[in-house]
Amino acid sequence: MENAFKLLYKTIEERKESPLPESYTNYLFSKGEDKILKKIGEECAEVIIACKNNDKEEVVKEMVDVFYHCFVLLAEKNIALEDVMREVKERNGKLSRVGDRREIDTL
């Protein structure tokens, strides 16, 4: 799975460095961070709706859209995927207790 993410991120970086006409990825880069963030928000809302509808297939599709748009944001912000993966690996296996988390009381 990690290879699929690496390949997707590499493609996004290539689009950023060498834009292709009619590329949706290039469209997002040309519109900038606000557009990318808006798309992430939209896709997250679609994940929520798919979950509420108990539509597993749609959840999977929408999660891929979330990952894609988050990867575009990472590339826009010049954050390497390896940095994110390193953080995931560092957190993997760590015991986290509910008491260690801040209370979520407002949105």
UniProtKB/Swiss-Prot annotation:
Question: Where is the protein situated, by its record's location annotation?
Answer: Cytoplasm
Reaction(s) the record says it catalyses: 1-(5-phospho-beta-D-ribosyl)-ATP + H2O = 1-(5-phospho-beta-D-ribosyl)-5'-AMP + diphosphate + H(+)
Entry-linked InterPro entries: HisE (IPR008179), PRib-ATP_PPHydrolase-like (IPR021130)
Molecular functions per Gene Ontology: ATP binding; phosphoribosyl-ATP diphosphatase activity
Record's superkingdom?
Answer: Bacteria
A single BP term in Gene Ontology: L-histidine biosynthetic process
Principal cellular location given in the protein's record: cytoplasm
Q: In which pathway does it act?
A: Amino-acid biosynthesis; L-histidine biosynthesis; L-histidine from 5-phospho-alpha-D-ribose 1-diphosphate: step 2/9
User: What family is this?
Assistant: Belongs to the PRA-PH family.
Name-wise, this protein is: Phosphoribosyl-ATP pyrophosphatase
Designated gene of the protein: hisE
